[in-house]
């Protein structure tokens, strides 16, 4: 007897009643994907030759805006590697590349109509906050004071 598990039409696994499930072969899917099956590093240009220099004024501004303490060497190394990665992404040639909105671009999504079932409960929601300002929640300050 052959059972067919088909919760989604694009992922089907056939098993016999007394055997284990076979592995799903993505190459046989009815909707092939544009996402590469293996990691691709060659598309990133090599911009690691230039050392990232961050002055103390910029570090202080980032600490103030992000409420993250960047005093340790590990935090600075993480910040520099993040900037280098963003620089790599900024230099990728995306000319003639159509935008990808979803990895399941051939599958139709069933959308429902937007109908408001509950509404006008702003006062009830804001009662949960300790501090509010002009109908907004006020969060507690982080680990760095905002006044400088």
Curated annotation (Swiss-Prot):
Pfam families to which the protein is assigned, alphabetical: GatC (PF02686)
EC number: 6.3.5.-
GO BP terms, alphabetized: glutaminyl-tRNAGln biosynthesis via transamidation; mitochondrial translation; regulation of translational fidelity
EC top class, as a word: ligase
Subcellular location: Mitochondrion
Keywords for this protein: ATP-binding, Ligase, Mitochondrion, Nucleotide-binding, Protein biosynthesis
One GO molecular-function entry: ATP binding
PANTHER family (UniProt xref): GLUTAMYL-TRNA(GLN) AMIDOTRANSFERASE SUBUNIT C, MITOCHONDRIAL
Additional note from the record: This protein may be expected to contain an N-terminal transit peptide but none has been predicted.
Oligomer and partners: Subunit of the heterotrimeric GatCAB amidotransferase (AdT) complex, composed of A, B and C subunits.
Protein family (similarity comment): Belongs to the GatC family.
HAMAP family registered for this protein in UniProt: GatC
Function: Allows the formation of correctly charged Gln-tRNA(Gln) through the transamidation of misacylated Glu-tRNA(Gln) in the mitochondria. The reaction takes place in the presence of glutamine and ATP through an activated gamma-phospho-Glu-tRNA(Gln).
Protein name: Glutamyl-tRNA(Gln) amidotransferase subunit C, mitochondrial
Native source species: Drosophila melanogaster (Fruit fly)
